[in-house]
């Protein structure tokens, strides 16, 4: 394992969530909050009965039934930052959110290397366009009075030794997300650090998938539970409320 990789993993254990200048009280959930989850197929699948969005919604409803909080899924398969920019008004802003969680970046990287995507003539997102796009979306979201929780991308491959082909680029794009969160005074949820720390601890056989994902990218039940716990922590909701069985939700269309 490289020294750089060790540093990333140690940081992952030490710090996953960083907050804006607002206090924890200000970042806590409030009555009638509307939380939109903006992302790709990981978030689209997160709306399934055992998905991370559904688990998060159920935990919030259980912890704070009196707050009438709505959770809205806005994930679409294959989407990248430019795709999210194009549908931001229809899929996010028109839902009148008070909180928007942006979990994007996997396809922005993966579409540079995935053979099927490359063969089709499609491409990933340049680092510059990734950064500019995140900045633009956050500005529009803040403009309607909503706050942003910006996530770093998770994994494309679960090998814990840093040998997954896209690891270096994912680290680069994650650093961009961290930079954007800081510059826009947004809350950062560093999913990549958390996932790397988990895999370093639980993937002793250096398997390429099966610990947190079904196919090296999309979440299995363990991955969805971890995602939900991390999101709940960012929202200051007790993770003990994560349902083990199929939960009832308070999700909005």
Placement of each model-derived feature along the sequence:
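Active-site neighborhood of phospho(di)ester-bond hydrolases with catalytic His/Asp-centered motifs
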Residues: 37-39, 73, 103
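Catalytic nucleophile-elbow at a beta strand-turn-alpha helix junction centered on a G-D-S/GDSL motif
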Residues: 33-48, 77-80, 109
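Bacterial N-terminal signal peptides
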Residues: 10-19
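Alpha-helical cap/lid subdomain in secreted, periplasmic
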Residues: 2, 29-30, 54-70, 82-252
